[in-house]
Amino acid sequence: MKLSMTYRVRTKGFNHIFNETVRLYRQAVSFFVDVCLTEWNLISTGKLQKERVNLVESLTVRTRQNPAVPYDFSAAFYKFPSYLRRAAIAEALGKVSSYQSNLENWEAAEPEKRGAKPSLPQTGFVYPAMYRSGMFIRTGMYQAAVKVFIRNTWDWVLVDLRKSDVDYIEHHCANYKECVPTLQKRGKKWYLDFVFQTAVQLPEVSIKDTRILAVDLGLNSACTCSVMTSEGAVLGREFLSLPGEYDSLEHAVSHIKHAQKLCARKTPGLWKQAKGINDDIAVKTARFIVDTAIKYDVDCIVMEYLDFAGKKRGSKKQRLHLWRAKYVQSMVMDKAHRNTIRVARVCAWNTSRLAFDGSGRVMRGKEADLPSYSLCRFPTGKQYNCDLNASYNIGSRYYIRELLKTLPATAGQVVTAKVPELAHRSKCTLSSLIKLNAALAA
């Protein structure tokens, strides 16, 4: 599989010039979008992207062999670079092709269920790709030449690249393939976004020999990890709490609440501080999970599938809004794939509510007269860490799903008859995995 990573390098100066360059590029994309919409019947005859780009150029670009064109691009965009022109055509083709597909699906759907008609494609906030030799030349370690619109023409200018950004890329991406950079604007600053690609081959390991890291992401603690095998054995446990970071986040949120009580003004500075602390928690959590997976040499990281759709209710809804669980999972997936580790998700229902020994529903916190909500009591009277109990159930559900996949349909029905809770994945626990292994061994 191919992995892509984007690193940004800040440029110094030339902000007004970059603004004009991007404005002209967006106008060119809008021009080609109108042409593609008008001549789509002809353009769609091309099967490949290159064929369609050539068809659009034959309609818009005057040459010695094609002096008369119905849509003269050069009349409105004098000396527009050919590399940038083809990039604008490709961008417009993608937008119009997507619109035509959506329109066909809308027309084929039932009138009562198809909803509103797809809107015409818009240019949007697109940015130009700086193709090498034509738009971008690296003149030094911390300097590059880019072709921009300056003094009413397209010319080369030298831009300085921030040293810390370049050094970071040289340190982390020396062995990766560097792709074409893209000019991007974030806030009031301009960056060159460099995309790096590498090919990774994930190992194929049988489910019997697979070692996993089951991860439970929590609201009270950052994460709880358990290293497990297919027999249900737990080889290791790791905890990450980050109490200082969570205290800082609570302190920042309380500042926001106090400011909102005093006046109705917006507080972007306070929200920026809280967001920065929250992002720091997410980054440290993702790094801890991947480092633990490498430490125990696991083949797969298993997490819950978290669905945040719908309105959040209850006294903890603000904490749910601030919870960066999906951000953590996306970072873990990127980091794990770079280290040839697979990532899987399982059903999250009842992972914390059911005891891993199969005794039934657990009671947490005040419900069981316990001092902390992170502790729970099983129906048998055993007191246990609730997040650790959930991580056992998460890992067990992954093994149950993968083991049942390897069985023929009839054999799977026989095993499900012996272990009835396997029919409902939301009721599976560690005891279900042990029973499944016993049924397979019988």
Predicted regions and their residues:
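Nucleic-acid substrate recognition interfaces
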Residues: 1-442
